[in-house]
Amino acid sequence: MAEQKAKVVHGPGPRGMGGPRPKVENPGKLLKRIMAEVFQHYLPHCILVLICIVVSALANVQASLFLQTLIDDYIIPMTQQQDPSFAPLAGALVRVGCIYVVGILAAWLNARIMVNVTQGTLRNLRIQLFTHMESLPIRYFDTHPHGDIMSVYTNDVDTLRQMLSQSIPQLVSSAITIVSVFASMCMLSWQLTIVTMLMVALMLFCSKKITQQSGKFFIAQQRDLGKVNGYIEEMMEGQKVVKVFTHEQKALEGFRELNDKLKDSAKQANSFANIMMPVNAQLGNISYAICALVGAAMAVTGMGGVTLGTVMAFLSLNKSFNMPISQVSMQANSIIMALAGAERIFKMMDEPSETDEGYVTLINAKYDKDDNLVEANERTGIWAWKHPHHDGTTTYHKLEGDITFTDVDFGYVPNKTVLHDINLYGRPGQKIAFVGSTGAGKTTITNLINRFYDIQDGKIRYDGINIHKIRKADLRRSLGIVLQDTHLFTGTVMENIRYGRLEATDEECIAAARLANADGFIKRLPEGYNTMLTGDGANLSQGQRQLLAIARAAVADPPVLILDEATSSIDTRTEALVQRGMDGLMYGRTSFVIAHRLSTVRNADCIVVLEQGRIIERGNHEELIAQKGKYYQLYTGAFELS
């Protein structure tokens, strides 16, 4: 927009993208909220997963304990027999094999279910994010970098995928394994259990120190990743400007700076995270070796009733005990990283939605036999405001397109007014043109009409109704808007025109294109109205894109038009085509027009000259020329329009 916008309060770093705070606040609350999302839709699945985890963990423990029986009751007696029978040993091995098969099947089922739970939860989160994003006010998008918003959908949601599919199930499995293995070790030998627990305490101490250091760097990594995404998005959108000013090297330097910061934060985070597994593995090996030495000594001396089978079973349990301890430490980093992403996700989801206290709605209407307006179920071409009253009655007022500003003051940020005491009116069928230098307040006025922003003081009335009483969706449905920056969606030409009114027929879309003088160039496209547009209509010229935007507004058939510099980027010949189409479109409609070219507003019923948020002149072209004021100076070239 050409007008003064809300000041973006930036955080550190290029392009002003701040990130999460140095530490995740309320990690317990965040984790609880994530799990609530999971349980809301997948509680039975989670119960089944828990059962599978318990079965798998107990199967592993039982297999380790069976080693004692296998060695003491089968293998050692066989070594003392001259002609041992292998049948009992084979039967024992089959039983061990069955235990392992049960554990493997439980683990496989657990993995399959968690894939379904994880992807379903992420799908629901993305839907909630997008649904909420659509309800956010324009102010949010004006004050938040789009690349940072995209990073929430991609990177932050993906960190939750790893946590839900791997980290949390492994933590639960580790907890169950630790409890069951600890009980089994105590049952086998409390002395060896004490030795193991001393080493576990050392492992936990090291893990805590490493996690504390890596946590802050994982959050910084997410922040820096958002900055990189934002910068790439900005450079892609502004690539033509970059090339025109030959700033490719400067753009590359900016990217390198952000990329280096991402590399540093990722390196620091992963340096700590990557040493955790080797450290814990080596401490586990030391624990295993000490238990083997102590256990062997106890078995030889017969201390505590420890046998060779007991030692072997205990060593197997020792491995099973150390592994989940290491996994807990390793998955803690993954959860911290996911919580950093979850904080950004829920921060966006907790942004207040656009408020709407309106209760006056826009309806299709018709006249009854007494010539009174009544609501119609079919499209009649007559629109009316349905105004319910406190006494239970309802009145219908035909939509005329009468818009009035009375003593309006407005500022994008508190204590900084950009519009001062604006008084103007647009009668049905009038063409009101706004002219003035960049930042004068032209686009801001049109933003107030469609309530992208709300005024601080004064009143805006639409057909005599305070626009705060009109439901925003109905208010905007009554307005046809051609924005300063034309945006086309991926799809056919016909689909882009129909976006103005989704129920419009092909014939109505073609008629709108003809009205906007777009039909000629559309027919020359390879597939005509079925030509696919991609990349915001990159295969069209700027003028053709503007013509499609005007056709899109025309098919909506609105009583009020807002044309925000609609022809500022079109060549003179195309402008003449557009102007003829626009004259037909604006006939009988209230129109608010902003243009850089004064030739496009000469036939306006009223020209409003703005300067620093104030109306300094108003009148038609002849009247303003006769005054020889600011408009005269702009028209004669004494001052530039922008």
Task: Enumerate the language-model features and the residues they cover.
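Juxtamembrane helix-loop junctions of ABC transporter transmembrane domains
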Residues: 20-28, 52, 59-75, 99-146, ...
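Transmembrane helices of ABC transporter permease
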Residues: 41, 45-58, 99, 166-220, ...
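Hydrophobic alpha-helical transmembrane segments of ABC transporter permease domains
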Residues: 32, 51, 106, 110, ...
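Short intracellular "coupling" helices and adjacent cytoplasmic loop segments at the cytosolic face
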Residues: 13-22, 119, 127-151, 155-157, ...
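ABC-type nucleotide-binding domain
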Residues: 82, 365-642
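An intracellular "coupling" helix at the cytosolic face of ABC transporter transmembrane type-1 domains
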Residues: 40-43, 138-139, 155-164, 168, ...
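Membrane-integrated ABC transporters
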Residues: 1-60, 75-96, 110-114, 118, ...
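Helix-loop-helix
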Residues: 77, 184-198, 268, 272-343, ...
